[in-house]
């Protein structure tokens, strides 16, 4: 599987409806660390004053942000994570269950030791367990995981 090497490239590759789902999820509960970047992207995209962008309802903010193809690397990463946490928890849970990794509704639980990289065999088996999910969603999820920790998830690029 060929992965996009940056979150921004992955974000650009998503269809508009997927970007809207991600932006809507983001604005439901915006991360304080990324809220400023998101508002800056809105200001730039629509040439708005910052206070006007802040005053928009969340659904309008989401519609605008979904059209921004280069929101910046950290914001793109946050949007991708929000897409999966809001809309695709069953996919996340199925993947982590197949790997035997502890999680809470698809979110890895804190580990006391640094995580070991996933073996190519385990990655192949876990991806095979996701056969009931849409292929494009699986590929986006795997690419997002890989972007978060390339060393741990290196085997995913070989699947």
Give the positions of each predicted feature.
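Charged, amphipathic alpha-helical stretches
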Residues: 2-35
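Short, solvent-exposed coil/turn linker segments
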Residues: 7-10, 74, 129, 155
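Acidic, low-complexity, intrinsically disordered interaction modules
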Residues: 29-144
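Short, charged, intrinsically disordered terminal tails
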Residues: 151-159
């Amino acid at each position: 599987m060929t992965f996009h090497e940056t979150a921004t490239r992955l974000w650009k590759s998503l269809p508009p409806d997927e970007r809207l789902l991600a932006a809507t999820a983001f604005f439901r509960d915006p991360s304080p660390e990324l809220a400023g970047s998101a508002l800056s992207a809105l200001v730039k995209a629509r040439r708005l004053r910052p206070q006007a962008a802040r005053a928009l309802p969340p659904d309008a903010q989401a519609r605008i942000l979904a059209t921004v193809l280069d929101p910046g690397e950290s914001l793109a990463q946050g949007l991708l994570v929000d897409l999966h946490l809001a809309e695709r928890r069953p996919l996340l849970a199925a993947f982590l269950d197949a790997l035997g990794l502890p999680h809470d509704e698809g979110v890895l639980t804190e580990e006391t030791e640094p995580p070991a990289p996933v073996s190519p065999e385990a990655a192949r088996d876990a991806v095979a367990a996701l056969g009931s999910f849409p292929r494009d969603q699986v590929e986006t999820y795997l690419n997002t995981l890989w972007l978060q920790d390339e060393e741990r998830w290196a085997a995913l690029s070989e699947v």
